[in-house]
């Protein structure tokens, strides 16, 4: 049993030794393999180093070759690019020679844009070999631009009539015609391109006008000028009157229609311009297009101004009307377009200055006409000058709006100075900014009317004192008649609302007239102031009532009685003469009543007192005492 165990242990040891031997054998092989690998790695490292030493320079050269290759490719591409315009030049030239009408505007514009791009690219390359191609392209572009301008001109002219009849549109309240939308689109495309070319050639900030603007302004300006020509002529012709003395009536001149047509045409033209041109060009194009028509307007206004100045007393109202018409036209156009205000102001200036100076001229003319009177009505009738002057003021009320603006511009009382007639104003249409905003034009005009009336009456008074040779009664009647005519014409017209608070000027002159007329009454009344001293014993005591005429007569001496008789006789003579002259005078109804009342109030109480005291002087025979209280009252009533 022990031998068996030993044998088993020996066998296991032998087996373990065998495994160890195997492992040692494998370890030795592994060690040998490792040494071989290390030797291979050493050789590989040496080989890699040699490769690196050789491959490094080759890599740098390769990169250089790659860059060179890329550059060559770029040059080839550039050459191809430069060759492309030259190759396509014939195709583009064919389109250009066809023109925008045949080739079609979009196709034509695309072609000319391609030519421009090719030309710019070639100029940028600056290659000597492309100089001929550059010259050819420049020629084509120039031809294309020229044809495009010609096409713009041709299309615009084909759509622009020589003239239209403006009254057709005004009477039917129709808008003035504009260019068709299809034509506007084509014109806009051409303008957009040609304007860009012009800015490129001259610089964006250049003040030089684009050829397209010149073409448009030339074509459309002639259309506007021709359309408005007949209305301009009509405005001057309607100013001519068959009767030189006839006063101008509002609306009878053609200027209103002329301005209305001008406004409609100009606004329609502005719509065209806004649809075709770029915004920054709207103002310049509009100004250039309208300028010839505005020049003609200025010429027309100067001609009318000459006519007005030659007939200032009858046609000054035309100046006022034109001021309002052109001011309204300017305001409407400025509100819509922001343009033409200064041009219209310059055209209006002569008329406006004449309108301002007319205020002074009319006052001076009033004085001149009065001073030129060689005779006045012997019966004291009112002078036609009073009626004419008031008719002038009444007519002015019909033009109150323009007159109010003129009044504000010259200031209250400005018509009293020569400066108003010289007109040193600038070429501007006044606005509220240029005025005293607190000024009331109507109030200033009312002041002017009052000054006119005062000037008229003062001049008539001075002239009457000369021509009537200080005959106060007829002077009084004359002044009173004229005052009444003036007052009546104020109350029966639009002047009443303006002058209601200023009628005191007439009251002053009415009192002057009454005072002059009643001077005769004062002379007559002297004969009714007795200074006879009666006997004290004949005087009634206090509270005894009035002493009878018979009692007074008893107390008079013969000398006093003769004196009383003479006073009655003198009164009768003066009174009858005054009554006769009163009835011979030509008086307005109001004047006759006023003066009759003043005479009665002045003389009747004095006569009644005198009659009460002394009517018994002729015992009722009527030799000296021709009028009793009743009969003289009847005479006074007959004066009314």
UniProtKB/Swiss-Prot annotation:
CC annotations in GO: cellular bud neck; exocyst
Residues that span the membrane, as ranges: none
GO MF annotation list: phosphatidylinositol-4,5-bisphosphate binding
Keywords of the record: Exocytosis, Protein transport, Transport
Entry keyword annotation includes Protein transport: yes
Pfam families, A to Z: Exo70_C, Exo70_N
Localisation per UniProt entry: Bud; Bud neck
Record-level GO BP terms: exocytosis; protein transport
Coiled coil: none
SUPFAM superfamilies given in the database record: Cullin repeat-like
Keyword Cytoplasm: no
Function text: Involved in the secretory pathway as part of the exocyst complex which tethers secretory vesicles to the sites of exocytosis. Also plays a role in the assembly of the exocyst.
Similarity-based family: Belongs to the EXO70 family.
Protein name: Exocyst complex protein exo70
Source organism of the structure: Neurospora crassa (strain ATCC 24698 / 74-OR23-1A / CBS 708.71 / DSM 1257 / FGSC 987)
């Amino acid at each position: 049993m022990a031998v068996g165990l030993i044998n088993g242990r020996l066998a296991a040891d032998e087996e373990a030794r065998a495994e160890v031997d195997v492992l040692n054998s494998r370890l030795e092989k592994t060690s040998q393999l490792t040494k071989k690998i290390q030797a291979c790695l050493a050789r590989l490292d040496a080989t890699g180093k040699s490769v690196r030493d050789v491959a490094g320079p080759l890599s740098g050269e390769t990169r250089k070759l790659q860059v060179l290759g890329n550059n060559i490719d770029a040059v080839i591409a550039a050459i191809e690019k430069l060759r492309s315009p030259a190759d396509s030049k014939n195709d583009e030239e064919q389109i250009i020679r066809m023109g925008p009408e045949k080739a079609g505007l979009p196709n034509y514009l695309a072609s000319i844009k391609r030519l421009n791009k090719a030309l710019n690219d070639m100029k940028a390359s600056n290659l000597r070999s492309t100089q001929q191609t550059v010259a050819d392209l420049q020629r084509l572009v120039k031809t294309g631009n020229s044809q495009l301008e010609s096409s713009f001109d041709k299309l615009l002219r084909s759509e622009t009539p020589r003239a239209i009849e403006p009254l057709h549109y005004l009477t039917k309240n129709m808008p003035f015609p504009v260019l068709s939308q299809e034509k506007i689109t084509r014109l806009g495309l051409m303008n957009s391109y040609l304007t860009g070319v012009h800015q490129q050639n001259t610089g964006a900030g250049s003040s030089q006008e684009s050829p397209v603007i010149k073409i448009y302004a030339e074509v459309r300006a002639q259309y506007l000028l021709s359309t408005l020509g007949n209305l301009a002529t009509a405005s001057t012709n309607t100013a001519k009157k068959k009767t030189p003395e006839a006063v101008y009536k509002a609306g009878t001149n053609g200027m209103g229609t002329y301005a209305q047509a001008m406004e409609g045409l100009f606004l329609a033209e502005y719509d065209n311009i806004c649809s075709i041109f770029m915004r920054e060009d709207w103002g310049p194009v509009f100004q250039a297009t309208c300028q010839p028509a505005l020049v003609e307007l200025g010429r027309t206004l100067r001609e009318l101004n000459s006519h007005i100045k030659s007939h200032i007393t009858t046609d000054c109202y035309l100046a006022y009307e034109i001021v309002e018409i052109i001011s309204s036209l300017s305001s409407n156009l400025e509100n819509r377009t922001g343009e033409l205000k200064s041009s219209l102001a310059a055209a209006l200036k002569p008329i406006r200055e004449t309108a301002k100076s007319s205020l002074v001229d009319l006052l001076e003319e009033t004085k001149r006409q009065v001073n030129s009177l060689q005779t006045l009505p012997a019966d004291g009738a009112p002078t036609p000058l009073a009626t004419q002057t008031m008719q002038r003021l009444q007519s002015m009320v019909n033009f109150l709006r323009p007159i109010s603006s003129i009044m504000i511009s010259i200031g209250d009382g400005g018509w009293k100075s020569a400066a108003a007639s010289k007109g040193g104003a600038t070429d501007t249409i006044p606005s509220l900014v240029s005025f005293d905003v607190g000024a009331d034009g109507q109030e200033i005009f009312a002041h002017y009317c009052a000054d006119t009336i005062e000037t008229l009456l003062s001049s008539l008074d001075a002239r009457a004192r000369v021509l009537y040779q200080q005959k106060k009664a007829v002077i009084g009647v004359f002044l009173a008649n004229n005052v009444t005519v003036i007052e009546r014409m104020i109350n029966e017209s639009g002047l009443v609302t303006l002058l209601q608070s200023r009628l005191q000027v007439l009251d002053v002159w009415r009192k002057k007239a009454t005072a002059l007329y009643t001077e005769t009454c004062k002379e007559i009344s002297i004969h009714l102031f007795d200074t006879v001293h009666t006997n004290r014993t004949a005087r009634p005591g206090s509270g005894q009532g009035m002493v009878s005429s018979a009692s007074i007569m008893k107390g008079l001496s013969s000398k006093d009685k003769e004196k009383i008789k003479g006073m009655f006789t003198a009164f009768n003579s003066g009174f009858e003469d005054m009554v006769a002259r009163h009835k011979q005078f030509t008086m307005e109804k109001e004047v006759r009543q006023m003066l009759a009342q003043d005479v009665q109030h002045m003389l009747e109480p004095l006569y009644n007192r005198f009659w009460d005291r002394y009517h018994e002087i002729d015992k009722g025979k009527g030799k000296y005492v021709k009028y009793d209280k009743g009969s003289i009252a009847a005479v006074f009533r007959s004066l009314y």
